[in-house]
């Protein structure tokens, strides 16, 4: 007659342990101190500083086929369903274990608000070969092993879900940061477009006025155009390409009108000069005729 006992960790302080215990054999529970007490799935030694070297004992009673546990003067105590079995450094009376009980060895050690050393916390499952406890449904060893395999798969799936959830949160944070960056870039682009439109409207009246200048104000327009070409607006990064093209067109028109003005001035000057030359030719016969009349009248007197 034997029993299979399984300890499933509740706080990741150890790996699942499963061992077969025989009647009238005492199994020691304690802290890992040497090679002989190295933790394994088939013993009850743990790599935890909150356990004593000899912390507790566990055995199967051959008469009742019940599993019992007791504390053997541990410093941090043994707890069954959150009930301490004995005071510090004092042995306890045997305590019967049932499937589903929660067993804690030691207590959590804190440094301010942080856990420095974890207690060993486990849920107990017990199956006796050929018999079952009245507190649990009957199940064979094969079904117990199958259930344990299913539990391990569930734990693995849960850990995987936690990792996926963390990755999803990280991805959502990344998307939010990218969205903020795009919004900032869009706002900057809109602001630049508004500035370009503002400066284009501001400069258009001046450029339009230069497109068809009059001869009377040609020199004044030339001076204003020179000042405008050297103003900060001409080198402003907000002036659009269309505005620059319009300015070039106005400049070309201005040069054309200047050429026309100079041509007209040259023609006028040429006509004045021709008149000055010809007026003497026009007036000479007139004076000759007048002189002839005067002489003729004097002769007949």
UniProtKB/Swiss-Prot annotation:
Native organism: Schizosaccharomyces pombe (strain 972 / ATCC 24843)
Residue numbers carrying Phosphoserine: 204, 231
Molecular function terms from GO: spindle pole body anchor activity
UniProt KW Nucleus keyword: yes
Protein name (database record): Uncharacterized protein C3H7.13
Stored InterPro entries: Cent_Immune-Sig_Mod, FHA_dom, SMAD_FHA_dom_sf
GO biological process: asymmetric protein localization to old mitotic spindle pole body; negative regulation of septation initiation signaling
Assigned keywords, A-Z: Nucleus, Phosphoprotein
Subunit structure: Interacts with sad1.
Region: Disordered, residue numbers: 187-236
Boundaries of every FHA domain copy: 27-85
Subcellular location as annotated: Nucleus
A GO cellular component annotation in the UniProt record: cell tip
Biased composition (Basic and acidic residues): 216-226
